[in-house]
Amino acid sequence: MPKPRLLIAASGTGGHIFPALAVAGELSEFEIAWLGVPDRLENKLVPGRYPLHTVALQGLNRKPGPQWLEAASQTFAAYRYARNLLSQERFAGVFTTGGYIAAPAVLAARSLNLPAIGHESNVLPGKVIRYLARWMRSLGLGFAESATYVSGATTRWVGTPVRPEFLISPNPLLDVPVPPEAPLIVVMGGSQGARAINQMVGECAPGWLERGWWIVHLTGAGEYDAVREGTPDHPAYRIYAFWEKMAPLLSRADLAISRAGAATLSELLVTGTPSLLIPYPFAAEDHQSVNAAALVRAGAALQFSQAALSAPLLDRTVQALLDNPETLARMAASARRLAVPDAARRTADLVRECVRH
């Protein structure tokens, strides 16, 4: 008997794609194909794993005008493309983690009476998911409290899936020889970088290094050269644009300084990493602040708005944390309590239930 076919619609950022890949890895009984957008991250991560179909698409601007008309035309074309794909290749259902591609995929599935299942990682669901949820068979949630933001939908708290490497015993940091007794700070600004965070950390770094602390600073592609040129060489200050082996890095970290994207927070929770969160101030509906607040309430993190934070305040806060191992231990324990390590399996179970019934 041939395997049932499942179309995964996930595009754009790692926050959409990595959870979808984790769920796909749990669904070996399905024949999976992927629907995305040209020139986005899925074009690097998906080929070689699953067949990838792409269709041009951009977000709808709030204000009507030429760009809005073009985006609306693309959305309708993407809907027709998705509908033809689902029909001609006899897919049994659609799974989406949100983003622009979710709308045409879910609406196409509904028009063919096929089940659509979604997953929302953020505490405050995105507008696309909030609008589409009523037409989904079920919506998996990364945070239980997210159900209050979604009306007319069947929801289930499943946690946010993380990459499989976060669920195995981490290997040693072969490329970063941090002494066992040395505190390690990991700084993460996102894939494109966070200039404000990078600048504040650069100001604080000399004092931290004098105290014997190690720093792994992930600048993002757009900020690497500026940070590298403005920072003196020091064996305990390692600067990279990206770092692929995040599971062992975060497992070794004593403290993370980070934005508050949902996928990153899930990785911090699974690894039990205390964090100082600086939400991206221009995120849609300030949803990163809502994410960060959930970890603060659980005792797993501290939160500062970018506008309110300065290098001296960052320095004092980090020193207070690293000088108090008991506080860090409590934060780490709180993070692990909030984590859902088997979120990928739980979400895959939800997909199975919806597609088969």
Curated annotation (Swiss-Prot):
Q: Where is the signal peptide?
A: none
Q: Could you list this entry's UniProt keywords, alphabetically sorted.
A: Cell cycle, Cell division, Cell inner membrane, Cell membrane, Cell shape, Cell wall biogenesis/degradation, Glycosyltransferase, Membrane, Peptidoglycan synthesis, Transferase
Reactions catalysed according to its record: di-trans,octa-cis-undecaprenyl diphospho-N-acetyl-alpha-D-muramoyl-L-alanyl-D-glutamyl-meso-2,6-diaminopimeloyl-D-alanyl-D-alanine + UDP-N-acetyl-alpha-D-glucosamine = di-trans,octa-cis-undecaprenyl diphospho-[N-acetyl-alpha-D-glucosaminyl-(1->4)]-N-acetyl-alpha-D-muramoyl-L-alanyl-D-glutamyl-meso-2,6-diaminopimeloyl-D-alanyl-D-alanine + UDP + H(+)
Entries under InterPro entries matching the protein: GlcNAc_MurG (IPR006009), Glyco_trans_28_C (IPR007235), GlycoTrans_28_N (IPR004276)
Binding, UDP-N-acetyl-alpha-D-glucosamine? T13, G14, G15, N122, R163, S191, Q288
Biological process terms from the Gene Ontology for this record are: carbohydrate metabolic process; cell division; cell wall organization; lipid glycosylation; peptidoglycan biosynthetic process; regulation of cell shape
Coiled-coil region list: none
The Gene Ontology terms for molecular function here are: glycosyltransferase activity; UDP-N-acetyl-D-glucosamine:N-acetylmuramoyl-L-alanyl-D-glutamyl-meso-2,6-diaminopimelyl-D-alanyl-D-alanine-diphosphoundecaprenol 4-beta-N-acetylglucosaminlytransferase activity; undecaprenyldiphospho-muramoylpentapeptide beta-N-acetylglucosaminyltransferase activity
Instruction: Write down the membrane topology.
Output: Peripheral membrane protein
Which SUPFAM superfamilies does this UniProt record tie to the protein? Answer: UDP-Glycosyltransferase/glycogen phosphorylase
Pathway of action: Cell wall biogenesis; peptidoglycan biosynthesis
Q: Which EC numbers does the record give?
A: 2.4.1.227
A Pfam family this chain is assigned to: Glyco_transf_28
The listed locations are:
Cell inner membrane
Q: What is its main location?
A: membrane
- Whether Magnesium counts among this entry's keywords is no
Q: What is any one of the record's Gene Ontology cellular component terms?
A: plasma membrane
Family stated for the protein in its record: Belongs to the glycosyltransferase 28 family. MurG subfamily.
The protein's job, in short, is: Cell wall formation. Catalyzes the transfer of a GlcNAc subunit on undecaprenyl-pyrophosphoryl-MurNAc-pentapeptide (lipid intermediate I) to form undecaprenyl-pyrophosphoryl-MurNAc-(pentapeptide)GlcNAc (lipid intermediate II).
Give the NCBIfam families listed for this entry: murG
HAMAP family listed in its UniProt record: MurG
Protein name, per record: UDP-N-acetylglucosamine--N-acetylmuramyl-(pentapeptide) pyrophosphoryl-undecaprenol N-acetylglucosamine transferase
